[in-house]
Amino acid sequence: MLSKETRKLKTHIMLTQIINGKILTPQGWLKDGSVLISDGKILEVTNCDLAVVGATLIDAKGMYIVPGGVEIHVHGGGGRDFMEGTEEAFHAAVATHMKHGTTSIFPTLSSSTIPMIRAAAETTEKLMAEKDSPVLGLHLEGHYFNMKMAGGQIPENIKNPDPEEYIPLLEETHCIKRWDAAPELPGAMQFGKYITSKGVLASVGHTQAEFEDILTAYEVGYTHATHFYNAMPGFHKRREYKYEGTVESIYLLDDMTVEVVADGIHVPPLSLIHISEP
């Protein structure tokens, strides 16, 4: 039941008010409050659940009210893959995610050929130009990876960083916002430094990097780790010597950010607990 009590605001704009839900705020969960929205923007989050006069009410009883998800690593959706590179595939995949709480998205390509990347970039730029588009840019997961850590990548597309490829590509396109690579590869430090100078997020992924590699990579611009724990080694031994793996090395750098596939399968629940500790 909605409260019969109301409150008035001095405004002539169209308002939408979400009430009765459990609201996630930076200070924690807020029960029995409300969120006031106008023209797609949040005007107010309050612990008062009195209905605002003139506002369209949405009753969220039994539900959570949380910020929309920003999907930074996603390969497709709705039965379509961003590797297809077509507007039809992109629209179908993006629409699927928009139905499930995502509000912004970075379509992701696995290790691809340059023509495939160009096709996807062209489509991405078209979608970014649409009004109120949720597409914020293109994410390239590869193809400069360690072959031994290829995982689900396409092996024949994997190679060492090649400036004759990536420099022209970044000059021709304007939508690539993130590019993942294995920093121990020949040319990977030059690659990371260059793409960072162009405003592209350099991320460590599909790698066998040890601490010295990670430290140098961080210094030249690699500040993120792709699906942390996956396709990267932990602590290991070579002959009588022991070495920090990629995982421990990233933990040692407080300013590096990570992403995890938090399904309890790619990363065990206990590891998720460790990651989430302050």
Residue ranges and their predicted role:
Residues 2, 7-51:
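N-terminal metal-binding scaffold of metallo-dependent hydrolase/deaminase domains
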Residues 21, 35, 40, 62, ...:
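Divalent metal-coordination and catalytic microenvironments
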Residues 75, 91-120, 133-146, 173-184, ...:
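Divalent metal-dependent hydrolysis catalytic cores, especially in the metallo-beta-lactamase
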Residues 79-84, 96, 106, 110-116, ...:
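Active-site loop-to-helix "anion-binding N-cap" substructures in soluble metabolic enzymes
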Residues 86-89, 120-123, 162, 240-246:
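Charged helix-capping and loop-helix junction motifs
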Residues 140, 147-163, 168-244:
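Divalent metal-binding pocket/active-site signature
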Residues 270-278:
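Residue-level detector of conserved catalytic or cofactor/ligand-binding positions
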